[in-house]
A protein has these predicted regions:
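A glycine-rich phosphate/pyrophosphate-binding beta-strand-loop-alpha-helix module
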Residues: 68-131
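Extreme N-terminal cap/leader segments of soluble proteins
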Residues: 1-67, 95, 110, 114-123
Length: 131
């Protein structure tokens, strides 16, 4: 497999991002591309709380950091705080990634590193989302 880290997201397109970056990273997560996620862990009827927010671009710009790791952490935190406010425990996050087409795969992967680290710190995972 060739190195794709310097490609821009706009060069790959949504399907290319799913196949090249997201599916290999989240092993078998089918939720990318249909804006939803299947949570196999939910076996019995129960109250389920769902939320999804993207990280506001102006807020990310205020971080003034070229590394998107912290923006990824913030993106996960925004969604986890919505669940906490509802008194819910997270089973997984359905995350919206709103990024310019000029973002490189390497930058996107750093954002994903931040999302994953925040999820791990709170005992959850990325279940799917939208690009």
């Amino acid at each position: 497999m060739s190195d794709t880290t310097e490609l821009r997201l706009g060069d790959l397109g949504e399907r290319g991002i799913q196949e090249t970056v997201l599916r290999p990273r989240y092993h078998g997560t089918e939720g990318f591309g249909d804006d939803s996620a299947f949570l196999a862990e939910v076996k019995t009827p129960a109250e389920l709380v769902a939320t999804t927010d993207s990280c506001p671009t102006p807020l990310v710009n205020l971080l003034a950091e070229p590394d998107l790791y912290h923006a990824g952490w913030l993106l996960a935190t925004i969604n986890l705080s919505d669940l906490a406010a509802a008194g819910a425990e997270p089973l997984g996050l359905v995350v919206n990634y709103t990024l310019p087409k000029t973002t490189t795969v390497r930058e996107f992967e750093r954002l994903l590193d931040g999302v994953d680290a925040c999820c791990a710190a709170h005992g959850t995972k990325v279940a799917g989302g939208d690009i």
